[in-house]
Amino acid sequence: MPSRQFSPGEQNMAAAPLSSVPMPAPESGLSQGARIVDTFVAPTKTFTDLRRSAAWWAPFLVMVIISSLFVYIAGQKIGFRRIMENQMQAQPKAQARLENLPADQRERQLEQGGKVTAIISYAFPVITLIIWLVIATALFATFKVAAGADVSFGVSLAIVVYAALPLMLKTLLAMLSVAAGISPDSFSFQNPVATNPGYFMTPANNVFLYSVASAVDIFMIWTLALTAIGFTCVSKVKRGTSFAIVFGWWAVFTVVGAALGAAFS
């Protein structure tokens, strides 16, 4: 049986390779700078991007720079000894023990206290990072076990760090007020600006109530809301559940911290 002969046109069509359909380029993620900006203006973009990369070095670096500058300005404008003396107003028992010392010992204690206050203040970023690790651990375990969330510890820590960015705005406000010449009589690093009811209270009158009132802070509530939104974005847990978990842990930490502060004040 004679074989079929292909025409030149048919041969060219048979030999021509099939044109490949171009694949769309993968969408690039947010830069670290864009993440920081979007945390304030479009937080869902930032937290959704954490599923791609859980890097949190940029907001931590911002915190280190701002807090270090704040501590330096406060040390120059107010002085660490004065700051330590103001802090002792919230510790009536410690204040009474200091006043019972002989004058030379009291002076020595105040000098040493000022130096210790400076060291602790400059170590604030390290202390904060440890606190973030504790908070991230508590939230990660709760979302994983209680809510069945599909979230890693690394992403949980990144959410906590990015959500804390509004607290840096509070630090900036405090730094500006100190630089502008705020009265040093009642300044403290723990509650430097009037963003909570505790700022208007006398700590020694009721240490527990003062601590609780200080925790009800505008910037802290903003941070808590961002944390809840973050876990909703990365884990698909219902927003109401996320808010209940985040604010529940905040209430626990606040009450326990206030109770310990009152017990050892």
Predicted regions and their residues:
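Short alpha-helical transmembrane interface motifs in multi-pass membrane proteins
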Residues: 29, 120-125, 209-214
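Hydrophobic alpha-helical transmembrane segments and adjacent short intramembrane/lumenal linkers
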Residues: 154-265
